[in-house]
């Protein structure tokens, strides 16, 4: 079965991951987010309890 022979496919996989890690990823990490996170504390509201009709 040729699927079990990793010789041609392992090198393709390694080259693909190296390309992703060394060339594409640093370019993607330089982009800034459109909405940076703020340092304000979030307003947490306490939910009102549900009035169950059978209690």
UniProtKB/Swiss-Prot annotation:
One of its GO terms (biological process) is proton motive force-driven ATP synthesis. Residues 35-55 are annotated as: Disordered. GO terms for molecular function: proton transmembrane transporter activity. GO terms for cellular component: mitochondrial membrane; proton-transporting ATP synthase complex. It is a single-pass membrane protein. Component of the ATP synthase complex composed at least of ATP5F1A/subunit alpha, ATP5F1B/subunit beta, ATP5MC1/subunit c (homooctomer), MT-ATP6/subunit a, MT-ATP8/subunit 8, ATP5ME/subunit e, ATP5MF/subunit f, ATP5MG/subunit g, ATP5MK/subunit k, ATP5MJ/subunit j, ATP5F1C/subunit gamma, ATP5F1D/subunit delta, ATP5F1E/subunit epsilon, ATP5PF/subunit F6, ATP5PB/subunit b, ATP5PD/subunit d, ATP5PO/subunit OSCP. Subunit 8, of the mitochondrial membrane ATP synthase complex (F(1)F(0) ATP synthase or Complex V) that produces ATP from ADP in the presence of a proton gradient across the membrane which is generated by electron transport complexes of the respiratory chain. ATP synthase complex consist of a soluble F(1) head domain - the catalytic core - and a membrane F(1) domain - the membrane proton channel. These two domains are linked by a central stalk rotating inside the F(1) region and a stationary peripheral stalk. PANTHER family: ATP SYNTHASE PROTEIN 8 (PTHR39937:SF1). Belongs to the ATPase protein 8 family. This is ATP synthase F(0) complex subunit 8. It comes from Anas platyrhynchos.
């Amino acid at each position: 079965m040729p699927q079990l022979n990793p010789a041609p496919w392992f090198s393709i996989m390694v080259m693909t991951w190296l390309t992703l890690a060394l060339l594409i990823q640093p370019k993607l990490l330089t982009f800034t987010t459109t909405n940076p996170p703020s340092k304000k504390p979030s307003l947490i509201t306490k939910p009102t309890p549900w009035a169950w009709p059978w209690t």
